[in-house]
Design a protein with these regions (language model features):
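Short, surface-exposed acidic-centric catalytic microdomains
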Residues: 1-46
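Short, surface-exposed connector motifs at secondary-structure boundaries
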Residues: 1-5, 54-56, 79-81
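Donor/substrate-binding cores of folate-linked one-carbon enzymes
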Residues: 12, 58, 62-164
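Anion (oxyanion) recognition and catalysis
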Residues: 23, 52, 101
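Generic alpha-helical structural signal
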Residues: 23, 45-48, 141, 153
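Short phosphate-binding loop-to-helix
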Residues: 35-61, 66
Length: 165
């Protein structure tokens, strides 16, 4: 269990299943289309305003495949965490599972890290490794996600309350 309360889900894909799940759980959702804004900074300003209005202490990214601008980093730097499907610093970026699979690594894993201005380059909070020698990238993806979910909760639970910098 996590001693925290989810106060807002921000999603850049209106209609995504996560929005439906959040609504069923009573979590407020802000779903937006980036193309409806003049710039990344413009939609991030809206996000920061909503986070500030709700007193958000920690921003947890999951499946948010966009690089954050200075707007978010300046407002919430040291208070943004991300889950990444590789043992960082190896296999940064959006195709980490496929890249690691094609490279032929035998030990895979996931990383929870702070977000900074370097792609998947923030301070590592937690990692978990596992062996995989199969030949099916979809099976590997399923294994990665099975490891990601509990590790993310454990890592967030282990952060000192109110001291995320």
């Amino acid at each position: 269990r996590l001693d925290a309360r989810v106060v807002l889900l921000v999603c850049d894909r209106p209609g995504a299943y996560v929005c439906e799940r959040a609504a069923r759980l009573g979590v407020e959702t802000f779903a937006f289309r980036p193309k409806d804004y003049v710039s990344k900074e413009a939609y991030e300003q809206d996000i920061v305003r909503m986070l500030d209005e709700r007193g958000v202490e920690l921003v947890c990214l999951a499946g948010y495949m966009r690089i954050l601008s200075r707007v978010m980093l300046d407002a919430y730097g040291g208070r943004i965490v991300n889950i990444h499907p590789s043992l960082l610093p190896a296999f940064k970026g959006a195709h980490a599972i496929r890249d690691a699979f094609e490279y032929g690594v035998k030990v895979y894993g996931v990383t929870v890290h702070y977000v900074n201005d370097e792609l998947d380059g923030g301070k590592i909070i937690a990692q978990r490794a596992f062996d995989y020698t199969g030949a099916d990238v979809q099976e590997l993806e399923a294994m990665v996600h099975a490891v990601e979910h509990p590790l993310y909760v454990e890592a967030i639970a282990g952060l000192p309350a109110g001291r995320h910098r």
